[in-house]
Regions:
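Cyclophilin-like peptidyl-prolyl cis-trans isomerases
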Residues: 1-169
Length: 169
């Protein structure tokens, strides 16, 4: 099983990836995280590779709901310069906390943004691709700490919560 570890300034979040239920989504995340997938730099328009998520922030945090990251602009409207289709699997539903899923702006608009739930969110079923889960207690504690951080306008944390790097094993 593939795992991805988000190394944040508040601690590490280890995620078990659902590569069998959401293979394209996992491949996209892993490719962006490890620098093997090409993306478009939103500030220059140039095509590039590199560790996409390194240095990005959790730009949206809603206590009791989710933490969201993966926007290269840090505001929620950025993407890697492409979109891809949803992957819904009958075995996966938003019936528990700590699920990793793609943020989107409608059907088949996945890119780089993702979120981790902090409670059951069944209203998201068949709207967002679930592609991983935070299983260990220490990692869940980091998610909870991020989810309860102070926020300001637009649900943005008042102090940046940074994804320093992502490792995949």
């Amino acid at each position: 099983m593939t795992t991805a570890t988000l190394h944040t300034n508040l601690g590490d979040i280890v995620i078990e990836m659902f590569e069998f239920q959401a293979p394209k989504t996992v491949a996209n995340f892993v490719g962006l995280a490890t620098g093997t997938k090409e993306y478009t730099d939103m500030s220059t328009g140039a095509k590039k590779t590199g560790n996409f998520y390194d240095g990005l922030i959790f730009h949206r945090v809603i206590e009791g709901f989710m933490i969201q990251g993966g926007c290269p602009m840090g505001k929620g409207f950025g993407d890697p310069g492409y979109k891809f289709e949803d992957e819904f699997h009958g075995e996966l539903s938003f019936d528990r906390p700590y699920l990793l899923a793609m943020a989107n702006s409608g059907p088949n608009t996945n890119g780089s943004q993702f979120f981790i739930t902090v409670g059951p969110t069944p209203h998201l079923n068949r709207k967002h691709t679930i592609f991983g889960e935070v299983k260990d207690a220490a990692s869940q504690g980091v998610v909870d700490a991020i989810a309860t951080t102070q926020t300001g306008a637009g649900d943005k944390p008042t102090k940046d919560v940074v994804i320093n790097s992502v490792t995949v094993a």
